[in-house]
From Swiss-Prot:
GO molecular function, one term: metal ion binding
Protein species of origin: Emericella nidulans (strain FGSC A4 / ATCC 38163 / CBS 112.46 / NRRL 194 / M139) (Aspergillus nidulans)
Name of the gene: bioB
Residues that bind [2Fe-2S] cluster: C140, C173, C233, R305
Name this polypeptide is given: Biotin synthase, mitochondrial
Classification via PROSITE patterns: RADICAL_SAM
Taxonomic placement: Eukaryota, Fungi, Dikarya, Ascomycota, Pezizomycotina
Note accompanying the cofactor annotation: Binds 1 [4Fe-4S] cluster. The cluster is coordinated with 3 cysteines and an exchangeable S-adenosyl-L-methionine. Binds 1 [2Fe-2S] cluster. The cluster is coordinated with 3 cysteines and 1 arginine.
Length: 393
């Protein structure tokens, strides 16, 4: 006996699953994509002449289209399965004279953090060995102070740390506040891979967060680092109370530097009790993802690094960021003064989703330029017409 289930439902609710609608044409898709995004997806090399309006066009693209475009750009310039594992150590904690509203290490706020002297060189190198043994390929060191003026002994110790980490075959990055041209050269000669100095936010919003160091002073330090031949690492913090326009402004400023930074850290504010921003809520995930995707598109060859606040994201949210172009994380025991995802946790996540750790210096030693990678993709497409084009939207 046959049974007809459709008779029990009103005719209006019966769906014709066999109906095939006409597919939208490529032109109809393109008409909904901002011109700036179309140009970015087709690009074969980074450009440093983005206008703020163009960055805004990209940032305001509907999120599903934006992340899809970011994934296409990511595959054009990077291995989409490779994630750089970095470990950050505080080599000098607390006692900083600056008034950064988000920072637990400022001496102006009562956060319960005890100031320390600089860690001994041997202790730092041992931490680097542990990080390497656990899979990290970049070791970063941070010191809580305004600048390096009058710190000759400290600079000497930092240079020993840099040389020691490089001898292990690891990349090494430091963040020491403002430095001058001579100090940058000394660090370069010691073997420094990268120098971190975040812009934090847009020029317009910056004075509401920090008053003891100007935006131009930050840009000057980046200039010294770049002129010394050291890779620039510079990004921002999300959730400071900024508007979308400030996230757009940050990315525009970084993209307008003489050359794009080697890495762009995306930090989500971790509210610290006792600081002026201690009662802030974490930024919504859609805005964080939108920032990651925009950074990937506007800074196509740059490493986009998930930094502070990643521990608050679910595994699925982290993977969404990776698929939208993030390709580095901080991992290990701590990230300066805040909690951090651990090595075992991250390796297990990579295994579940098909990612793997980027090798040390992989970005530098890979002989293929972005254009050569594009040519390779095109060649594979000719051999296999079914393969999707990297830039297709």
């Amino acid at each position: 006996m046959s049974v007809s289930f459709t008779r029990s439902f009103p005719r209006a609710f019966i769906r014709s699953y066999g109906t095939v609608q006409s597919s939208p044409t490529a032109a109809s898709f393109a008409s909904r994509i901002p011109p700036a995004l179309q140009e970015a997806v087709a690009a074969t090399a980074p450009r440093t002449n983005w206008t703020r309006d163009e960055v805004q066009q990209i940032y305001e693209t509907p999120l599903n289209q934006l992340t899809y475009a970011a994934a296409a750009v990511h595959r054009r310039f990077h291995d989409p399965s490779a994630i750089q594992m970095c470990t950050l150590m505080n080599i000098k904690t607390g006692g900083c004279s600056e008034d950064c509203s988000y920072c637990a290490q400022s001496s102006r706020y009562s956060t319960g953090l005890k100031a320390t002297k600089m860690s001994p060189v041997d202790d730092v190198l041992e931490k680097a060995r542990i990080a390497k043994a656990n899979g990290s390929t970049r070791f970063c060191m941070g010191a809580a102070w305004r600048d390096m003026r009058g710190r000759k002994t400290s600079l000497k110790n930092v240079k020993q740390m840099v040389s020691g980490v490089r001898e292990m075959g690891m990349e090494v990055c430091v963040t020491l506040g403002m430095i001058d041209a001579d100090q940058a050269k000394e660090l370069k000669d010691a073997g420094l891979t990268a120098y971190n100095h975040n812009l934090d936010t847009s020029r317009e919003f910056y004075p509401t967060i920090i008053t003891t160091r100007s935006y131009d002073e930050r840009l000057k330090t980046l200039s010294h680092v770049r002129d010394a031949g050291i890779n620039v690492c510079s990004g921002g913090i999300l959730g400071l109370g900024e508007a979308d326009s400030d996230r757009i402004g940050l990315i525009h400023t970084v993209s307008s530097l003489p050359s794009h930074p080697e890495s762009f850290p995306v930090n989500a504010l971790v509210p610290i009790k006792g600081t002026p921003l201690g009662d802030r809520k974490m930024i919504s995930f859609d805005k964080l993802l939108r920032t990651v995707a925009t950074a990937r598109i506007v800074l196509p060859a740059t490493i986009v690094r998930l930094a502070a606040g990643r521990i608050s994201l679910t595994e699925e949210q982290q993977v969404a960021c990776f698929m939208a172009g993030a390709n580095a994380v901080f991992t290990g025991e701590k990230m300066l003064t805040t909690d951090c995802n651990g090595w075992d946790e991250d390796r297990a996540m990579f295994d579940r989703w098909g990612f793997y750790p980027m090798r040390s210096f992989e970005k530098e030693t890979n002989a293929a330029t972005p254009q050569q990678h594009v040519d390779s993709v095109a060649h594979e497409s000719e051999k296999n017409p079914a393969a999707p084009a990297a830039e297709a939207l």
